[in-house]
Amino acid sequence: NIRLFDTMTVEENVKVGLHNTEAYSTLSGILRAPAYWRREREAHERALELLSIFDMQDLADHQAGSLPYGAQRRLEIVRALATNPSLLLLDEPAAGMNPSETVELMENIVKIRDTFNIAIMLIEHDMNLVMNICEGICVLNFGKVIAKGTAEEIQNNETVIEAYLGKRKEA
């Protein structure tokens, strides 16, 4: 489910994530003091910088609810990045995306990991995405860990193959 503020702009949605770093008092905000305007200008610049990761800066003034599904998913990730996390949890980020959007998402996840130097925990059923970007993979079957390892180790793990593809028949 998309968890955006549909009637707010793309930029305003990102700024929601930036509010945990407010650098002015409530009184400064009420009075619209110089500290307030300075912080608002910084928030605007930071929001556009984060949006540029997904090449969404030109959509800053669009209403979030009017964006296509894939763009809304990307906006959710940008808003999460605005909180300056040390761990980014992505729960099925490619769900509902077409193949070209998924490829773009893969590139952006790697870019985020490398640029922000943050750990990313990914829960995903798109095995192409998982096998191409994950450094370590943990496979669950009915809530129990059945394998941990690299993409190559997981792809060759008999327990994983049996759990997800079925047992091989003897010829």
Language model features with spans:
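Glycine-rich phosphate-binding loops of nucleotide-dependent enzymes
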Residues: N1-A171
